[in-house]
Amino acid sequence: MKKLILILSLIAVVGCKSKKVQQKEPKPDDIVKLATSQINSSQKNKAYELGKRVLMTCNTSKFKAFTTSEATQSVINNITIDKLSKTCTKYRMWYGTFIDLQLAEVYQNTKNQTTVYRFKALYTKKVANKEMRVFMNAENLVSAIKTSDWVDAFKYN
């Protein structure tokens, strides 16, 4: 009887093993790092200006909302002064005053023609090691903005 219970328990444990869920992530050959000669300078400047506008809100507490000629509707709806104020309060406390953005790398997703501008965000406190990614779609509109801790290796997400 003990052996039967042990065998059934073992079967139950093995049968209930969790399975890994595969996330759909772009294949490495779908993401191409662009050389400086391949970068569209007007799109680069637009990404820089719009990214800087978001982070300058932390210094000035004033935000000029994006227009439909600058960003997609989802970005316009998601970036509000309330959300920025909460983020800026944390950033100013931890990293100090925002200084500037420094372009580090540019990648392009060849499947959906999204260009990712990777900027290093410079702050007054030396502990700040942040990055800002500005995603520009094929229509030259900001389709996403993301800030995170700086990591040298690029991972598309």
PLM regions: where:
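Exposed beta-sheet edge and beta->alpha loop/turn motif
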Residues: 106-157
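Positively charged n-region of N-terminal signal peptides that target proteins for export
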Residues: 1-4
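Short, low-complexity N-terminal intrinsically disordered segments enriched in polar/charged residues
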Residues: 18-57
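Hydrophobic alpha-helical targeting segments used for export or membrane insertion
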Residues: 6-11
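C-terminal motif of bacterial Sec signal peptides marking the signal peptidase cleavage site
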Residues: 14-15
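Acidic, low-complexity intrinsically disordered segments
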Residues: 41, 57, 93, 151-157
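Short solvent-exposed beta->alpha transition segments
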Residues: 65-113
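Charged, alpha-helical scaffolding/interaction elements associated with membrane systems
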Residues: 60-61
